[in-house]
C-alpha cells in the first residue's frame, strides 16, 4: 500500500514537472516570436538637407511656372540584412534602391512635369510591396506610417526653401498617391492656400479622407484650383481593387469631366469614367506593356499605366491650373 502511494506521488510530481516544462517551452516560443518582431530592420532616416536625397529639375526658365512636389511609388520587395533581419522599407542610403526610384520613375515623371516648372522629388523609406499584397487596410496603414513621416519631413524641408508666391503642385503615384492624401491632411491652411492642385494618380480618395480634411476637395473641371485630381484605370469595373482603387471621387484627365462622357486619346484609346465605381474604363487598349504583377496588379486593372498613359494631359493641366492660380492670386 505504501509502495503504491509512493508511485502515485511520483507520478503527480512528474506530471507537475511536465506541465512546468511545457509552460516554459511555450514562454520561450512567445519570447522567440517577440524577438522575431523586434528583429525587423528599420533603415537609417533620410537627411533632406543632403542633395543626395532628392531628384530635382528646374525647367522654369521665365519664372512663371509652379513648384511640383512629387512622391514616388513602390519599387522594393521585403529584403533581409546580412545578420538576418527582415526589412519592410526601401533604404534611401542604398544606391540600388535610389536608382530604382529615380531611374524607373522619378526622372521619367520629371521629363514631363518639369518643363515650365521646378520639380522636386524626395527619396523616402517607402513601404515594400508585400504590405499591399496582404490586401489588408490595417497592415498597409501601420506599415506606411514611417513612410508618411518621411514624406511630411521632406515636404517641410521643401516648403521652407521655396518661394511661396509661386503656385504649389503636389503629385504622387500609387503609394505616392497615398502620400499625397496624407500630405493634404498634414499641411496647414496657409500652405493649402498656395495649392494650385494635388494629383492622386493610381490611388483612392475616400469619404473618410475628405471628412478628415477640408483641404481635400474633388476637382470638378479643368482649371479649378485648390482641388484634388484622382483617378484609377481598369479594363472593366469588375477589376477594381478596393484597397487601391476603391475611391469615392474620380475625374477623367483626358476631357476633365466627372460624368460618363467618353474621351479619346490620340492613339484611339477611349477613356470613360464610371460614375458608379469612380474609376476610368479604358477600351481599345491592350495594355500589353504592363504585364500582370504576381497576380496582384495589372490583372484587368491597369495600375501601372497611371503616370504614363495620361502624361501629356497631366503636363498641360498642371500648367493650366498653375496659370489660373496665379490669375486668382494676382501673382
Question: What are the functions of these language-model segments?
Answer:
Residues 64-66, 115-119, 164-167, 193-197:
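Loop/turn elements at helix/coil->beta-strand transitions in domains of secreted/extracellular proteins
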Residues 2-11, 15, 20-106, 111:
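Flexible, membrane-associating and regulatory peripheral segments of lipid-active enzymes
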Residues 72-166, 291-305, 311-331:
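Active-site catalytic motif of lipid deacylating hydrolases and related acyltransferases
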Residues 172-176, 180:
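Gly/Ala-rich beta-loop-alpha elbow adjacent to hydrolase catalytic centers
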Residues 71-74, 123-127, 173-174, 200-204, ...:
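Active-site-proximal beta-strand/loop segments in catalytic clefts of secreted hydrolases
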Residues 128-131, 177-178, 205-209:
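Short, well-ordered, mixed-charge alpha-helical segments that flank or form enzyme active sites
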Residues 147-164, 185-330:
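Surface cap/lid and interfacial helix-loop subdomains adjacent to catalytic sites
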Residues 67-71, 120-123, 169-170, 197-200, ...:
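Structural recognition of the beta-strand scaffold that forms the well-ordered cores
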Amino acid at each position: 500500500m505504501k509502495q503504491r502511494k509512493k508511485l502515485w506521488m511520483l507520478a503527480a510530481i512528474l506530471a507537475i514537472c511536465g506541465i512546468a516544462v511545457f509552460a516554459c517551452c511555450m514562454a520561450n516560443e512567445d519570447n522567440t516570436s517577440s524577438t522575431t518582431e523586434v528583429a525587423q530592420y528599420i533603415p537609417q532616416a533620410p537627411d533632406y538637407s543632403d542633395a543626395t536625397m532628392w531628384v530635382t529639375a528646374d525647367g522654369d526658365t521665365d519664372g512663371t511656372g509652379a513648384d511640383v512636389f512629387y512622391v514616388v511609388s513602390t519599387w522594393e520587395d521585403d529584403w533581409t540584412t546580412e545578420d538576418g533581419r527582415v526589412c519592410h522599407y526601401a533604404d534611401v542610403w542604398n544606391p540600388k534602391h535610389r536608382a530604382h526610384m529615380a531611374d524607373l520613375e522619378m526622372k521619367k515623371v520629371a521629363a514631363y512635369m518639369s518643363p515650365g516648372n521646378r520639380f522636386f522629388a524626395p527619396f523616402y523609406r517607402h513601404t515594400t510591396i508585400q504590405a499591399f499584397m496582404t490586401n489588408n487596410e490595417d497592415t498597409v496603414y501601420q506599415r506606411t506610417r514611417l513612410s508618411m513621416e518621411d514624406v511630411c519631413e521632406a515636404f517641410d524641408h521643401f516648403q521652407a526653401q521655396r518661394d511661396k508666391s509661386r503656385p504649389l503642385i503636389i503629385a504622387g503615384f500609387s503609394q505616392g498617391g497615398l502620400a499625397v492624401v496624407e500630405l493634404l491632411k498634414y499641411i496647414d491652411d496657409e500652405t493649402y492656400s498656395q495649392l494650385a492642385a494635388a494629383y492622386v494618380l493610381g490611388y483612392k480618395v475616400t469619404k473618410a479622407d475628405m471628412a478628415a480634411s477640408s483641404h481635400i476637395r474633388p476637382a470638378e473641371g479643368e482649371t479649378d484650383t485648390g482641388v484634388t485630381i484622382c483617378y484609377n484605370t481598369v479594363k472593366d469595373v469588375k477589376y477594381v481593387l478596393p484597397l487601391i482603387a476603391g475611391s469615392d471621387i474620380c475625374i477623367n484627365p483626358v476631357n476633365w469631366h466627372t460624368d460618363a462622357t467618353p474621351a479619346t486619346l490620340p492613339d484611339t484609346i477611349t477613356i470613360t469614367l464610371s460614375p458608379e465605381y469612380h474609376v476610368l474604363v479604358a477600351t481599345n487598349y491592350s495594355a500589353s506593356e504592363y504585364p500582370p504583377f504576381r497576380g496582384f496588379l495589372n490583372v484587368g486593372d491597369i495600375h501601372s499605366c497611371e503616370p504614363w498613359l495620361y502624361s501629356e494631359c497631366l503636363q498641360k493641366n498642371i500648367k493650366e491650373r498653375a496659370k489660373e492660380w496665379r490669375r486668382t492670386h494676382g501673382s
